[in-house]
């Protein structure tokens, strides 16, 4: 039977999903991240399907989201979007360490994945942590600087003011920007899924990254899936492909 356990790890609320018959085993583990203005519970389908296939799954809530959502307005969530992404990236080692101390994870078989903001998060994690084995990025962008400037322009056009220096904040994203250093992927398995009609995170970002990886001779382990009609919403086919990719590569 698949178990869903709500717990707090290092003050981070997560859903922990696993097969109860293997509850105490060191299992391959997937950290899967939700999208902007969403929450961990909406991604339980991924956790269930992956746990059926023998993986341990951790669904965290990002800062300002889910159980970590305080009095922040929609505007504040938008203004601090990249702080939320960086928070996810910086918190990952804490989650891994805590689970390893409990003897629950196979440290040689760790993966990250996510949709939209979760995919953006996952790209940054792959740029930061060589110990991650697999990544699944659904409707995201690895082009941190370019996308950050586009988002900032959109926020400014709505009359919102930033309580910080935008250029300085964007410059701070450089270490997480996989597009600027694609060789950091180091031929690790990566699945990229994107809908061509995406009106939130442009499809061009995924296409451009794949082309860059091809140019660097690093596309052998990359699965690039394109949905010709999808907007900013993962399809059933995309979800099942992501689960199958993680099962195969992890």
What does each model-identified segment do?
Residues 1-25:
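N-terminal cap/lid segment of alpha/beta-hydrolase-fold proteins
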Residues 36-48:
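The serine-hydrolase catalytic nucleophile loop
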Residues 49-73:
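Conserved alpha/beta-hydrolase
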Residues 95-154:
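Primarily recognizes the serine-hydrolase "nucleophile elbow" in alpha/beta-hydrolase
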Residues 146-207, 211:
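The feature captures the conserved acid-bearing segment of alpha/beta-hydrolase catalytic domains
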Residues 207-250:
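C-terminal catalytic histidine-bearing segment of alpha/beta-hydrolase fold enzymes
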């Amino acid at each position: 039977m698949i178990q869903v356990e709500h717990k707090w790890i290092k003050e981070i609320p997560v859903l922990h999903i696993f097969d109860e018959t293997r509850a105490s085993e060191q299992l391959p583990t997937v950290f899967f991240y939700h999208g902007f203005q969403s929450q961990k519970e909406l991604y339980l389908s991924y956790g269930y399907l992956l746990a059926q296939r023998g993986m341990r799954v951790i669904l965290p809530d990002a800062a300002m989201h889910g159980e970590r959502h305080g009095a922040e307005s929609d505007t504040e969530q938008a203004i601090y979007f990249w702080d939320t992404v960086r928070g996810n990236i910086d918190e990952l080692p804490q989650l891994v360490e805590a689970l390893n101390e409990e003897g629950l994870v196979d440290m040689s078989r760790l993966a990250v994945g996510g949709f939209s903001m979760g995919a953006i998060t996952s790209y940054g994690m792959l740029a930061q942590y060589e110990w991650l084995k697999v990544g699944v990025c659904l409707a995201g962008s690895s082009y941190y600087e370019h996308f950050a400037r586009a988002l900032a322009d959109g926020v400014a056009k709505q009359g919102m003011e930033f309580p910080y220096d935008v250029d300085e904040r964007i410059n701070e994203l450089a270490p997480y920007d996989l597009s600027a250093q694609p060789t950091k992927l180091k031929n690790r398995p990566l699945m990229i899924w994107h809908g061509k009609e995406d009106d939130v995170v442009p499809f061009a970002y995924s296409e451009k990254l794949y082309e860059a990886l091809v140019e660097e001779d690093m596309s052998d382990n990359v699965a690039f899936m394109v949905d010709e009609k999808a907007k900013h919403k993962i399809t059933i086919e995309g979800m099942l492909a992501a689960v199958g990719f993680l099962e195969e590569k992890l």
